[in-house]
Amino acid sequence: MLEGRILAVSSQTKAVSGIPGAPKRVSFAKVREPLEVPGLLDVQTDSFEWLIGAQSWRERAAALGDNAVSGGLEDILAELSPIEDFNGTMSLSFSDPRFDEVKASTDECKDKDMTYAAPLFVTAEFINNNTGEIKSQTVFMGDFPMMTDKGTFIINGTERVVVSQLVRSPGVYFDMSVDKSTEKDLHSVKVIPGRGAWLEFDVDKRDTVGVRIDRKRRQPVTVLLKALGWTTEQITERFGFSEILMATLEKDNTAGTDEALLDIYRKLRPGEPPTKESAQTLLENLFFKDKRYDLARVGRYKINKKLGLNAGQPIVASTLTEEDIVATVEYLVRLHAGDTSMTAPGGVEVPVEVDDIDHFGNRRLRTVGELIQNQIRVGLSRMERVVRERMTTQDVEAITPQTLINIRPVVAAIREFFGTSQLSQFMDQNNPLSGLTHKRRLSALGPGGLSRERAGLEVRDVHPSHYGRMCPIETPEGPNIGLIGSLSVYARVNPFGFIETPYRRVVDGQVTDEVDYLTADEEDRHVVAQANSAIDREGRFTDSKILVRRKGGEVEFVASSDIDYMDVSPRQMVSVATAMIPFLEHDDANRALMGANMQRQAVPLVRSEAPLVGTGMELRAAVDAGDVIITEKTGVVEEISADYVTVMADDGSRKTYRMRKFARSNQGTCANQRPIVDEGQRVEAGQVLADGPCTENGEMALGKNLLVAIMPWEGHNYEDAIILSQRLVEEDVLTSIHIEEHEIDARDTKLGAEEITRDIPNVSDEVLADLDERGIIRIGAEVRDGDVLVGKVTPKGETELTPEERLLRAIFGEKAREVRDTSLKVPHGETGKVIGIRVFSRDEDDDLPPGVNELVRVYVAQKRKIQDGDKLAGRHGNKGVIGKILPQEDMPFLSDGTPVDIILNTHGVPRRMNIGQVLETHLGWIGKTGWNIQIASDGTRPDWAATLPEEMLSAPADSNIATPVFDGAKEDELTGLLGATLPNRDGEQMVGPDGKATLFDGRSGEPFPYPVSVGYMYIIKLHHLVDDKIHARSTGPYSMITQQPLGGKAQFGGQRFGEMECWAMQAYGAAYTLQELLTIKSDDVVGRVKVYEAIVKGENIPEPGIPESFKVLLKELQSLCLNVEVLSSDGAAITMADGDDEDLERAAANLGINLSRNEAATVDDLAN
């Protein structure tokens, strides 16, 4: 019997993923996974621990046998030290970086706009080389941002994520191109360092070998060899086998080392007088001095591996060596000659082949630790210059390390990276999955990477070496497609930055549970079987020929004795979000991509509900995302409330876990935690104590299980529109809470200090009714757009006083100051309830920016029910907008009277080839109703159930099911289970074995003519809500130049009546409507005021005038020295004056219109 058939037993009732107290899921998995899913945040946390040299990292490195014994900060300080003055008489060196305690907790940092950071100290030693005197001090190097335990950084109160960057690895790369004229194969090689000048060799169409140093002019390669000290005889002895190199040597005019050095100097420094010494120094500095040139450990490793150098030796040199250059030239000429292998100096045989730059053996990850380390290096090099200058200017006797060091460049470099780098991003906190995916993202963009404009198709495409390392499905749809990816579930990053993936070792055709992590290069040397290959109890393959893959993604059938490794899991190749799509194997990749991306846009609902049909990944994803609370020690729940849970541990210690209550996420969604344990309950270490947003019982719960019918309905669900039941609105099934933060500050201005107050000029008492005595709105107040949240007045500029007014003021004292209302108001289109207020004041010693005396934040929560125009989606890329919400009684219903919740159109399935949604619907129905498989009296099962374990023969109603990707429920199992579903209370089985039911029209009660697919599908409410998009304007801000309304909701702009819309008007001959649209409704400044006046007075609309954009066009032409005049029908010139300005301004003043052409920044500015 196959091992795969028995093993599903293990996952039926035991806790999933080794997490105690985990909810039960009935699993269809056939493949036993020997390896636990690794920590999903390890890519972030491990890298940062290496940077700061944490003890946990040192222990891990020792266990892995990694020869790196120092952390990232130690490395960079060692690289910088010693800093010597220009004469070498004194030096300053740094060592022993260490951190103090962090200044404030993560919650306090978010609340007070602080950075979560710890003070960094290093030991600095100043040595006077003349006297031998040593002065040692501990020096403060600034506050260093620390990573939270969730893998994020808190910078100025906002949570940010540093994305890992995919870059070309330093090393040596051989390439081949075809010459267009001669059709010859031309070979070239680039030696790319981590830092420093590039060295390029190539063979041209005349069969000579050339070299380019630092991308300058090409010259014969023998010039470089001679400059390195090689004689013609040595070159002939080493390269005598190569005709092309001998031909190059003949064409080389330089005689000896000196001439070669001068020749190189002339090409690198044209215009400067060449000398032998300066040429020697230049060449040494370019490639052989570690201050200017650094291959990095990974570059040295790659060169050694490619060229077969220093085999078995520890990786030491970070600069180029003479042997590297010679071996590279030899490899190039052998490649051009068509050789397939060469013997390296150490006797190692290495293959000679062209490199694939898109292979994951040649692309590596710069993780967060390395990115920060590079930025610190920039800051320290700036500081180094300052230190050198101070050494020369200060008195030697008085110098101490503290007087030499200026930490400002280092602090500024770190701040610049976290604040402005393309790779330090505002964290996506829409839901726990979006945050987790953001931390596991791989980006080829950013400094030192690609740009989306120049990236071609090859670098964006899926590559065989991505298997198990980067997900082939999850990537954005826009211009970044293929440049941004996501780390696969089991992948990890090795010390060199290459992504490794685990494989089960196969020994003599027997699969063992020993797991090896392989890089893409190592994997190419092996034959790998897939995870679902059939094996027996002993781990031997049952088939004579097994499907395997070899180098380059080629697949073939081979004997079991030829297999080296086997995949550890069927979900090994995909990312976390993709692994949460059930029946992924039945979905087209384009739609699966949309499904993976749209799960990240799910809005947390008021009540979360875990999916009936999951994949078994939901628990690990939710736990590792960090939005649920996990028990640290085994014990008993002592006290519980909505705000906290106290656990008394078995060792006698107490720990209180505080909940986040209705907090605002970065995206304005509601992050709320609630306990799921009871008082007196025993809890294990690692057990989930409290659910967060989008989780239920510790499982990821992004949407709702809804009863779906797949059928057209009166054309209302045409083109992906969705029909919903009114029940979902009334019972708040798809209701979400959104929290907006509004902020205002009171500053010092030139005319005096602004003031937060209730005393606002020209405002009625009704407007101030909900403000307290300070002028701040009360918690619990219902507000709508235009309501005052915080009252604020700003001093106005006072006009010059007349002598009489001055006299009166002198007699009667200070007149009330002139102030204007600059209160914080609810923006256009927003409503809600005030749920929180934070006031920061300089008087209370709060840390505020310069010039700010007081800062007030108001949090407004909005409960958004589902409505027409909101966007819903399944997990298979099946998305749509709600077209109609029907009363419950009008929805189609089943034979027992149950109305369906949602109607999807049948046309959304076949063309898009995402059949997974239909299978999910059927399996959802099976899980909802439960099942019982009939066993014959002699104990025989139906054929389709022969492989199901004992525990799956029956299940109660509302059973949660796991169907893992590439290892889920099969079609015959679904058909059989549909026939075995439990009947309803009337003893009726409403859905047949084909997954279809007779539905009745809710309006007439008549049955529909054909059976309809009915079942439960997991539906997600996306962040694209109609409330955030709908927008209308009557009057508002205008552009300063064209005087046309601005565009976009954010600018309170108008609707653009564009070129094609004008054509439509012309086609229908609607001349007057078109004239009105192009003039008085847009940029006829005079006309629009007169129209306003006419409407107010009830008069006829006046004739339109000349649009402002026409005047702009005239000015444009006049600026080109073209004298353009506008003539009337009788040939008289028309002036472009604005008519009677006085009448216009008088009318505008009477009507309360602001005619100043300033572009208003906000809607509030218009009101002022």
UniProtKB/Swiss-Prot annotation:
Disulfide bonds: none annotated. One of its GO terms (molecular function) is DNA-directed RNA polymerase activity. The keyword Transcription applies. Its EC number is 2.7.7.6. It is an enzyme of class 2 (transferase). GO terms for cellular component: DNA-directed RNA polymerase complex. Pfam families: RNA_pol_Rpb2_1, RNA_pol_Rpb2_2, RNA_pol_Rpb2_3, RNA_pol_Rpb2_45, RNA_pol_Rpb2_6, RNA_pol_Rpb2_7. InterPro entries: DNA-dir_RNA_pol_bsu_ext_1_sf, DNA-dir_RNA_pol_bsu_external_1, DNA-dir_RNA_pol_su2, DNA-dir_RNAP_su2_dom, DNA-dir_RNAP_su2_hyb_sf, RNA_pol_bsu_bac, RNA_pol_bsu_CS, RNA_pol_bsu_protrusion. It catalyses: RNA(n) + a ribonucleoside 5'-triphosphate = RNA(n+1) + diphosphate. Keywords: DNA-directed RNA polymerase, Nucleotidyltransferase, Transcription, Transferase. The keyword ATP-binding does not apply. One of its GO terms (biological process) is DNA-templated transcription. Belongs to the RNA polymerase beta chain family. HAMAP family: RNApol_bact_RpoB. The RNAP catalytic core consists of 2 alpha, 1 beta, 1 beta' and 1 omega subunit. When a sigma factor is associated with the core the holoenzyme is formed, which can initiate transcription. DNA-dependent RNA polymerase catalyzes the transcription of DNA into RNA using the four ribonucleoside triphosphates as substrates. This is DNA-directed RNA polymerase subunit beta. It comes from Rhodococcus erythropolis (strain PR4 / NBRC 100887). The gene is rpoB.
